[in-house]
């Protein structure tokens, strides 16, 4: 098995808090050093938490690259929402959301009376529940606008992409 994450969101995507790779899986994260949309440093921290054999996990931070480095246009500023200052969201080994966001949901804003009620709402009305979570981000004033995206690195990146899968799947 082979997994290649490109400019992954490693704080808010609900990744496992204590991740573990199966013995036959290789994982490569590729990130732009200048990416201010999904931060490379968050993925560096995530990679350190992954239980794996030596050489099974690698992160490659590309110097001078931004988010969407293979877009085919020069880097430019866009008004996309940036959530880099928002509370982290992880999932424990039982599949439950954990992290600072839970304290905000249950204690500070009292969106749900209990963790069980929050889980049930997520199952029964996921869109409505997501909107409530996003509302917390607004109240926390952790949403900013403005990131830089773009780049013309596809020719430089494609051999790494292809070779990773050839080496690990064929």
Q: What are these model-derived regions, one by one?
A:
Residues 55-170:
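C-terminal catalytic histidine-bearing segment of alpha/beta-hydrolase fold enzymes
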């Amino acid at each position: 098995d082979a997994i290649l994450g490109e400019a992954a969101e490693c704080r808010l995507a609900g990744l496992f808090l204590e991740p573990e790779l199966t013995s036959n899986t290789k994982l490569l994260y590729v990130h732009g050093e200048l990416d201010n949309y999904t931060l490379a440093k968050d993925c560096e921290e995530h990679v350190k938490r992954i239980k794996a054999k030596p050489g099974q996990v690698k992160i490659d931070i590309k110097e001078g690259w931004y988010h969407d480095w293979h877009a085919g246009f020069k880097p430019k500023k866009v008004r996309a929402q940036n959530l880099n200052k928002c509370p982290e969201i992880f999932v424990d080994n039982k599949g439950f959301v954990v992290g600072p966001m839970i304290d905000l949901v249950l204690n500070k804003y009292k969106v749900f009376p209990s963790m069980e009620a929050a889980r049930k709402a997520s199952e029964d009305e996921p869109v409505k529940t997501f909107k409530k979570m996003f509302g917390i981000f607004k109240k926390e004033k952790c949403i900013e606008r403005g990131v830089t995206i773009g780049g013309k690195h596809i020719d430089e990146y494609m051999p790494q992409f292809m070779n990773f899968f050839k080496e690990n799947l064929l």
